[in-house]
Amino acid sequence: MHDLDHYPKSTQKIRKQLEQTGLVISEYLPYQKPLKHHFPERNRLISGLSKGVLITESTIKSGTSITTNCALEQNREVYVLPGSMFNDMTMGNLMSAQEGAKIVISPKDIIDDFD
């Protein structure tokens, strides 16, 4: 699978592993450059293909927040790590919790929820 224009380039190592043993999908043609509106569309796929998503850090306006909103709309489980209301990097987590995401403090919380 050498004909896709991957973004970001920093994911090359894990991408190579996925190409060997997993699956790489795209809604776009090979060599199509990433455009701003592609990212929310990609995030919709990420959440749609998942049983649930774990949010570790998210600002109020971020790609992570878009993924969270997509997951909630798709009736996926959304888990968030708690954060400080004084930290911009976790304000998205707190807002997601208000919108229905489950607060978790250990991996066991998620495992128990899946059982």
Language model segments and positions:
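Glycine-biased, small-residue-rich flexible motifs in mid-sequence functional cores and linkers
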Residues: 1-115
